[in-house]
């Protein structure tokens, strides 16, 4: 008889919840099974998915990153200023922001490691810095009218049934695949899991915890910058207040996806499903038409509470027990 590893239970529960919700929604609204709706579900949640990729790295390492929403907002407004104000080509602007995001994240990781400061405090500080910098650039929404944006918006992969999977959705899926490969098939991934499992023991095992911590937050901020690029392409504008509170949505997606808040357990597949659950609930409410979109937050809060409780039970039952006698 095959035994199920207790640490895979959160992921299996997440998968079961998604399948059940999708089935119930499809029974009520058969159009949910169309490739158009599926493509829209992926496209509309592409920026959140990319944020969840970076957040998965951070939470797996035992940390937290509250700055990703602000970095995303700063990226959108900085892109608009560079493209519309300075006349830079979008590709050059994208490159600048990805590098800036990586450097910003590495600075966060370095501060956390060398100052021995809690990730919550350091990333909260980084959130204020990034949001303040965005507001210094502009307090208004800046439209981006470059022809490149128009061209990119027309790029898509046609699915059976007529659905069109946009470039930004493909970028999100590529980010999840790349993140999964890095976590599960490289030594870097092993170091991240070890750091999240027990940072002290990871250091005793010879793992460079400083480099790993810096890498993790560098990846997170790079993904936040990429999310800003995706959102800029999606809305064709830049706004300093973009992404307010979205870091909490990313954390919720990762935790609902089965990654333990304490670190060391989880994966990319679960985070993707966590993102899709959030998108599915919002789509269901939109189809219904009689409910406020704020019900999405209530539903996600309830799911988050349930999954955190499930995590506590798993940690309790999987913890080694002492023997007497």
Per-region residue spans from a language model:
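Transmembrane alpha-helical segments in multi-pass inner-membrane proteins
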Residues: 224, 234-301
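Cytosolic-side transmembrane-helix boundaries in multi-pass membrane proteins
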Residues: 1-23, 27, 197, 204-211, ...
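Transmembrane helix-bundle core of multi-pass membrane transporters
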Residues: 5, 119-188, 212-215, 235-243, ...
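Helix-loop-helix "hairpin" substructures at the membrane interface of multi-pass membrane proteins
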Residues: 89-97, 103-108, 159-238
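Structural signal for alpha-helical transmembrane segments and their membrane-water exit/capping regions
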Residues: 17-33, 61, 135-138, 179-187
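Hydrophobic alpha-helical segments embedded in the membrane of multi-pass proteins
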Residues: 45-54, 70-74, 103-106, 125-128, ...
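Alpha-helical transmembrane segments within multi-pass membrane transporters and channels
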Residues: 87-127, 273-274, 278
